[in-house]
């Protein structure tokens, strides 16, 4: 049977080797991405024209009638009064 010390040395060697390989791979990947970002021009989107705003005021026929406003106000007042009790 193999000595526990040699097993630990083998495990540490394997761990350090794996970590070194991953570190080198990630370092190369970072530099390749930086290189590609400098080589490939950035796509600049065309400016979107702002939609024209309608400056016309809506006609008063589509506005809420004063009777509806009064009814809504009365309903809100009644609701708040019933909650306060």
UniProtKB/Swiss-Prot annotation:
Pfam families given in the database record: OAD_gamma (PF04277)
GO annotations of cellular component type: plasma membrane
GO molecular function: decarboxylation-driven active transmembrane transporter activity; oxaloacetate decarboxylase activity; sodium ion transmembrane transporter activity
Disulphide linkage map: none
InterPro entries tied to this protein: Na_pump_deCOase, OadG
Record bears the keyword Translocase: yes
Membrane topology of the entry: Single-pass membrane protein
EC number: 7.2.4.2
Keywords recorded for this protein, A-Z: Cell membrane, Ion transport, Membrane, Sodium, Sodium transport, Translocase, Transmembrane, Transmembrane helix, Transport
Cofactor: Na(+)
Catalytic activity as recorded in UniProt: oxaloacetate + 2 Na(+)(in) + H(+) = pyruvate + 2 Na(+)(out) + CO2
A biological process from GO: sodium ion export across plasma membrane
Compartments, as annotated in UniProt: Cell membrane
TM stretches of this protein: 11-33
Keyword ATP-binding: no
Family designation: Belongs to the OadG family.
Description of how the protein assembles with itself and partners: Heterotrimer of an alpha, a beta and a gamma subunit.
Function description: Catalyzes the decarboxylation of oxaloacetate coupled to Na(+) translocation.
Protein name: Probable oxaloacetate decarboxylase gamma chain
Native source species: Vibrio parahaemolyticus serotype O3:K6 (strain RIMD 2210633)
Highest classification ranks of the organism: Bacteria, Pseudomonadati, Pseudomonadota, Gammaproteobacteria, Vibrionales
